[in-house]
UniProtKB/Swiss-Prot annotation:
InterPro entries with a match to the protein in the record: UppP
Family assignment from sequence similarity: Belongs to the UppP family.
Catalytic reactions of this protein: di-trans,octa-cis-undecaprenyl diphosphate + H2O = di-trans,octa-cis-undecaprenyl phosphate + phosphate + H(+)
Protein name in the entry: Undecaprenyl-diphosphatase
Membrane-related topology note: Multi-pass membrane protein
Transmembrane region(s): 25-45, 53-73, 93-113, 121-141, 171-191, 196-216, 231-251, 263-283
Alphabetized HAMAP family for the sequence: Undec_diphosphatase (MF_01006)
Length: 288
């Protein structure tokens, strides 16, 4: 009977991992904050695992979502793709150089502030404030953007300086509730790129950023003396695979969506969610 109960509990853990993977796959690419959603979802659907594992899980799971970008854009991102002309190969290498340049600010500040941010800012109130602030920012920027023609409508024409500026906006995403994609897309629009260019560059920028951040979290996890059981590895794998599959659909949806729409609806969603998170955090603080 005990074995049956343990098996049932483990199956429930795997189902939770599937749900968390779905949340990650949706929220990683839409500018609505994957970390903010995972913090909220974990309150109601918490894995029966150690805090250290959950903290690592919430970050390393991003690799599944990032892998979806590599699959969808493989030909475009691969400088060794058969059939590419010398000009196309050159543009691909230049694209990667822009991505590397854009990663520099977040790599520096991420390493410097990661532990402090996790200790002091991973709470409901910070997440709620960031959701609302960036929600308002999206609505305001999109309203202003209707009267301004983008200066950069082709990623190949984006300068290295513009890439660096977008990288500076990515630094803001180390604050929980901001949204990495939200910060970089908003930054791209502010510095003069079209929505599609900002979204594309956001996807590409996520590859080294999230691989690096996930690697850092995994290393810290093991340095702190933690181990990874077979059951935990399976939970992480299930969530990552789910995030990968969902991301394949979400990325394509977003790229089709922004051809005819702006990001205002996501701004409104962030404001509503931020108010809900703030209310929940206040209730939890008062009543425990």
């Amino acid at each position: 009977m005990e074995i049956i109960m343990q098996t049932a509990q483990y199956i429930i853990e795997l189902l939770k991992a599937v749900f968390l993977g779905i949340v990650e796959g949706i929220t990683e690419w839409l500018p609505i904050s994957s970390t903010g959603h995972l913090i909220l979802v974990n309150e109601f659907l918490n894995l029966r695992q150690s805090k250290d594992f959950i903290d690592m899980f919430n970050i390393v799971m991003h690799l599944g979502a990032i892998l979806a970008v590599m699959v969808i854009y493989f030909k475009r991102l691969n400088p060794f793709q058969p059939g590419k002309t010398a000009r196309e190969v050159q543009l691909t290498w230049k694209l990667w150089l822009k991505v590397v340049i854009a990663c520099i600010p977040s790599a520096f500040f991420g390493l410097l502030l990661d532990d402090w941010m996790e200790a002091h800012l991973s709470n409901f109130f910070v997440v709620a404030i960031m959701l609302v602030v960036y929600g308002i920012a999206f609505i305001w920027i999109e309203d202003r953007n209707r009267r301004v023609d983008p200066k950069v409508t082709d990623l190949a024409r984006m300068s290295y300086k513009t890439a660096f500026y977008i990288g500076l906006f990515q630094v803001l995403s180390i604050i929980p509730g901001t949204s990495r994609s939200g910060a970089t897309i908003l930054g791209g629009i502010i510095v003069g790129t079209s929505r599609s260019v900002a979204a594309d560059f956001t996807f590409f920028l996520g590859i080294p950023t999230m691989f690096g951040y996930s690697g850092l979290k995994a290393v810290k996890y093991f340095i702190d003396g933690n181990t990874l059981t077979g059951g935990q590895a399976a939970i992480l794998l299930v969530a990552s695979v789910t995030a990968f599959l969902v991301s394949l659909f979400v990325i394509r949806f977003l790229m089709n969506y922004i051809k005819k729409h702006d990001f205002t609806v996501f701004g409104k969603y962030r404001i509503v969610l931020g108010i809900i998170v703030l209310f929940y955090g206040a209730v939890k603080l008062i009543f425990g």
